[in-house]
Every structure is written in structure tokens, then in C-alpha cells.
């Protein structure tokens, strides 16, 4: 199984009044489209801390530029590239080239808890985006309430699922820990496994002869480069989606705080989606009842 390389971009949004900068990444859209989305939401309905910041000072005082093109297989790799730039900006790292003047800049903090409007406001907003009484699909509904960075957490995790299971690879562990524990796989694995054991979270170690191995391209790539002596004793940690999610919710890393933020937000989204569907259904019933009454009035007039 071969995973094709994709192209993503790391960008910086700067302003003309201080040294603050916001680092972001994009996969399918151009950086100009990303900027237009931020500016539009800042003017109308900010969904994240940065858009609120942009709203205070006015989108016209901000500009965007690309700082790196990234070729990646998994979105986690793009997340790590984005995090590297945010980390080095805050720490005053040294780089040369187009992005060199970003270092020692203050990155705008963009990780507050998600704040939802009132239920009635959410329902009204969703109804405004409903066309011909066709209910919004859940993903579209969530995109009205959550910023792209929050939604991207769910997309990134889903990308690693294979038939409801996750291989806890070095890349996954690096994504979880980020710059807190860079390039220290044994440390990452130890603390991950400690959480799994302490909380008795179901997991499984599989060998190279297990049928499940064939479903994970990363494991197959490792097998191709392992000598026979190592291959016979090598084991890979695999978990089902629910167990992996539980482990993420318990780990004390910045990335896992984002994961908790995402899942808690999705629980609230699910509740609000139910309110929206209820209102939409009742509105349709009320409309049908009114039409029936109008037809009766017409018949007897």
C-alpha cells in the first residue's frame, strides 16, 4: 500500500502595528483563501481567538504570506511543521531565507475553550444556511460553529484510522508530544504506555504475521527494512478508536488539550444539532398544517 505525497503550506499572518504573528497551515485551499476566510469571520462572527484579535484591530491591518511549502503523507506531518514555526517564533530561533524575520516574534495565543452562542442563536444561524428545508449534514453544521483548527483535530485523527483501529506509530507519538519531547521515541512510548496501563485502556501488540499488519502501510514499510532477526521479535502497538481517544483525553500535552477541546466541542455540537433538527422538523410540520388550512379555506370560499 503506497501513500501518495500531498502538498500543504505554512503561512504567517502579520499586522502593521506590532510584532504579533499568527502561524497557520492549509491543505486544500490557497493561503489567500485562508486569509479571506479569517477576514470575513473577523468582520461577522469570529470563531477563534485569532479572529477575535483580528476583529479588534480590523482585518485591513493584517496581511498574509507563505513561509514554507510542505510535502507530506500524513496531516500529522503538516501539523508538526506548523508547530515548529510557532515554537521557534516564541523561542527566538534562528533561520535564514524568506521566513528569517519571523523569529523572536510573539505568536498570538489561539487555544481558548470554544464558546458557543445561545441555543436559539445557533438554531437561527443553522436555519439561515438551510436550503429548501434539507437538513444540514453534521459536518456542515459543525463548521458554522467551530474554527478550522479545532475541526482539523478530528480530521487528522480520522486519517490514521484503519477499520476502526490506530497504529500508535513514532509519528503519532511525536504529534501527541510535539516539541515537549522531540525525537525521544522511548520517552514518548513509555509515558503513553504508562497512561494506557494505569487506566487499564484496552490495547494490543501485534507481530509481523498478524493479518492486521497488512492494513497499515507504515508497519509494512518498517517490515520491508527490518532484518529477519529483529522482525521475529518486533511488536507494534495497535488500539481501537475509542481506546486511543480515551488515552489522548488523559495525556497532559498541549496537543491533547486541543483533542479534549475538540471532543467536548463536538458533544455540544451534537446537542445543538438535535435542537436544530427538532426546530426544522416542527417548522416543516407547522408549514404543512398551515398549507392544509389554507387549502380548506380556499375550498369553502
UniProtKB/Swiss-Prot annotation:
A Pfam family that the UniProt record links to this protein: MSV199
TM ranges: none
Family, per entry: Belongs to the IIV-6 019R family.
InterPro entries: GIY-YIG_endonuc_sf, MSV199_dom
Origin organism lineage: Viruses, Varidnaviria, Bamfordvirae, Nucleocytoviricota, Megaviricetes
Name recorded for this polypeptide: Putative MSV199 domain-containing protein 093L
Organism superkingdom: Viruses
Amino acid at each position: 500500500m503506497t501513500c501518495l505525497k500531498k502538498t500543504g503550506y505554512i503561512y504567517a499572518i502579520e499586522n502593521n502595528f506590532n510584532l504579533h504573528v499568527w502561524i497557520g497551515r492549509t491543505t486544500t485551499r490557497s493561503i489567500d483563501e485562508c486569509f479571506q476566510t479569517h477576514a470575513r469571520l473577523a468582520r461577522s462572527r469570529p470563531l477563534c481567538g485569532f479572529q477575535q484579535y483580528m476583529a479588534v484591530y480590523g482585518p485591513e491591518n493584517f496581511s498574509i504570506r507563505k513561509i514554507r511549502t510542505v510535502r507530506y503523507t500524513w496531516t500529522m506531518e503538516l501539523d508538526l511543521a506548523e508547530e515548529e514555526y510557532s515554537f521557534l517564533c516564541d523561542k527566538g530561533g534562528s533561520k535564514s531565507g524568506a521566513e528569517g524575520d519571523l523569529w523572536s516574534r510573539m505568536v498570538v495565543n489561539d487555544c481558548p475553550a470554544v464558546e458557543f452562542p445561545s441555543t436559539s442563536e445557533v438554531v437561527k444561524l443553522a436555519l439561515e444556511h438551510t436550503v429548501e428545508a434539507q437538513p444540514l449534514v453534521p459536518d456542515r453544521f459543525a463548521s458554522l460553529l467551530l474554527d478550522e483548527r479545532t475541526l482539523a483535530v478530528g480530521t487528522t485523527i480520522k486519517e490514521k484510522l484503519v477499520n476502526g483501529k490506530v497504529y500508535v506509530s513514532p509519528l503519532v507519538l511525536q504529534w501527541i508530544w510535539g516539541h515537549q519531547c522531540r525525537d525521544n521515541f522511548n520517552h514518548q512510548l513509555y509515558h503513553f504506555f504508562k497512561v494506557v496501563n494505569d487506566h487499564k485502556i484496552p490495547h494490543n501488540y501485534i507481530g509481523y504475521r498478524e493479518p492486521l499488519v497488512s492494513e497499515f502501510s507504515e508497519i509494512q514499510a518498517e517490515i520491508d527494512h527490518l532484518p529477519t532477526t529483529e522482525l521475529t521479535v518486533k511488536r507494534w502497538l495497535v488500539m481501537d478508536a475509542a481506546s486511543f481517544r480515551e488515552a489522548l483525553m488523559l495525556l497532559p500535552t498541549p496537543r491533547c488539550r486541543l483533542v479534549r477541546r475538540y471532543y467536548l466541542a463536538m458533544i455540544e455540537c451534537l446537542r445543538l444539532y438535535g435542537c436544530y433538527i427538532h426546530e426544522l422538523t416542527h417548522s416543516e410540520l407547522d408549514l404543512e398544517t398551515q398549507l392544509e388550512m389554507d387549502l380548506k379555506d380556499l375550498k369553502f370560499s
